[in-house]
Amino acid sequence: MLLATLLLLLLGGALAHPDRIIFPNHACEDPPAVLLEVQGTLQRPLVRDSRTSPANCTWLILGSKEQTVTIRFQKLHLACGSERLTLRSPLQPLISLCEAPPSPLQLPGGNVTITYSYAGARAPMGQGFLLSYSQDWLMCLQEEFQCLNHRCVSAVQRCDGVDACGDGSDEAGCSSDPFPGLTPRPVPSLPCNVTLEDFYGVFSSPGYTHLASVSHPQSCHWLLDPHDGRRLAVRFTALDLGFGDAVHVYDGPGPPESSRLLRSLTHFSNGKAVTVETLSGQAVVSYHTVAWSNGRGFNATYHVRGYCLPWDRPCGLGSGLGAGEGLGERCYSEAQRCDGSWDCADGTDEEDCPGCPPGHFPCGAAGTSGATACYLPADRCNYQTFCADGADERRCRHCQPGNFRCRDEKCVYETWVCDGQPDCADGSDEWDCSYVLPRKVITAAVIGSLVCGLLLVIALGCTCKLYAIRTQEYSIFAPLSRMEAEIVQQQAPPSYGQLIAQGAIPPVEDFPTENPNDNSVLGNLRSLLQILRQDMTPGGGPGARRRQRGRLMRRLVRRLRRWGLLPRTNTPARASEARSQVTPSAAPLEALDGGTGPAREGGAVGGQDGEQAPPLPIKAPLPSASTSPAPTTVPEAPGPLPSLPLEPSLLSGVVQALRGRLLPSLGPPGPTRSPPGPHTAVLALEDEDDVLLVPLAEPGVWVAEAEDEPLLT
């Protein structure tokens, strides 16, 4: 998603660049586009693809001959070498523009043709143009005569015998003798169509010194050729052109051609001082007037660059040739001295003015409010206004370091050039820019690239981790290396019992040593029972001294007794009571225990034999609920019983207890039972031993034994 957004931003910046244009077919192809509206706007078509192909777009504004088309330029910035905008009307000569005129253009005659041309071949392009037009009826001045066709002619053309209106309305109703005061005076012969070869000179149009009206159009040409290869500077010190009059300046000798045109002046330039600089050492000045023109013409001077007129003062050394110096103004007149405007590039004409200390420049001419304010050279043309009227930021031939000079002779910050936002008043800081993305797009692209790089690193890390895990799974079936084999195939450390048996550590009292040849559970139980037999008191009397067991062993024995795996220890009284309850059927128990008569003789009743465990009591069958209670009878004392071991083997008791706990369902199946007999009594005893594990000892004995040592759980 982020990459798609960046691509859209880049594409939007490319489409918004002014060097990409496309010309609409209705204006840039034959026939030209016809505009029938009374008013409207026109602008240079926007560029889309490239600047390789030339273009020629034409618009035709239709109107009647009685109407005047007024054209106002909101913007006009064209590259004079490769772009041109021309305007033509029936009553107006061709006007060629690449910069905006100072005032609106009024083109009489109705139909006006506007043509925009571009050379192509990737030639430089300006910012384009934007103009508005309107068709109005021409309102004549007080000293003019309005014809029936709404044209305005001079009042002196009224009844002069010449049809100036075109419809004869200016001659209608006139007597045969014209008014003597309106008869034109003869014009004296003045120098015209001459060549001026001096290094400097002065020339003027015919009739400039005195106002004279000519009844026919007039054209004059001056060739300026001082025979020097340096450039010429032609300065028009006074302009008073009539409506329809024009002055054209061409570079080089020869007949006037539009390709060599340097500047065109009309009545819109009246009252201004205009300087034209040639590209070569020669120039041609052409002057054209219309019939009965009320303009006086012009007055001009010329000189070779590097020289000044005798009545002018030279500028300082800092005003030599170079970029940004203007139109060859290396000289200034006395009227330009201390007027608050820099006519020299280094400000020589504004140095040492009254009211300012040395090294300072005044903000205005003498006698004005700005004459008392002075500024240093470092405060000039730095895009920071010092003077109240901004005189320190006007007519900048050079800008302070870090600033850019606009074509309107003002300065802006250099970092603002070609940033996509016009900062100069004429927008020249965005002209002739190579394709540069705005800072916002560049910032977004950098941040996006960093994020993408981070995501790529994370993806690579995850891939490597997954690959390592997959490789580790496959390595299970691979042969182990020597180091891995040593780690995996290590022998387990010996147990505590093995260490005691091997003599590595001293034996602990009552801790069963492990026999390497006997690893069965039965062997371990026999070892445990052996310890229990050794724990019995040899005499069996109450005063016999018990052998002290280890703490671990005592804890183990207590747990086995609690679980019912070992019988409780009985007192002598309980042992004698058990002997009195033994039946003759207990004789086969001696055979089950595996003991012999002589071997049993060594034991004593009541626990005298240390190796004999106390006998297990016989469980009496519970009375059935369905049977009626029988009268209580005292059983007769049985006869003498054969000798019976009172204390069955501890091993058999433990084994039977394990059998009863683990295999409780084992028993002799059969639906019927035979009457009890001597043999069945023995089997019943064994079965009862299987069912009844170990009777619980009396609470007093258990408590007394528990108080012997607390149980740690």
Curated annotation (Swiss-Prot):
Position of the signal peptide: 1-16
Phosphothreonine modification, residue list: 596
Molecular function per GO: low-density lipoprotein particle receptor activity
Transmembrane segments: 441-461
SMART domains: CUB, LDLa
UniProt keyword list: Coated pit, Disulfide bond, Endocytosis, Glycoprotein, Membrane, Phosphoprotein, Receptor, Repeat, Signal, Transmembrane, Transmembrane helix
Protein name as catalogued: Low-density lipoprotein receptor-related protein 10
Naturally occurring in which organism (per UniProt): Homo sapiens
Name of the gene encoding the protein in the UniProt record: LRP10
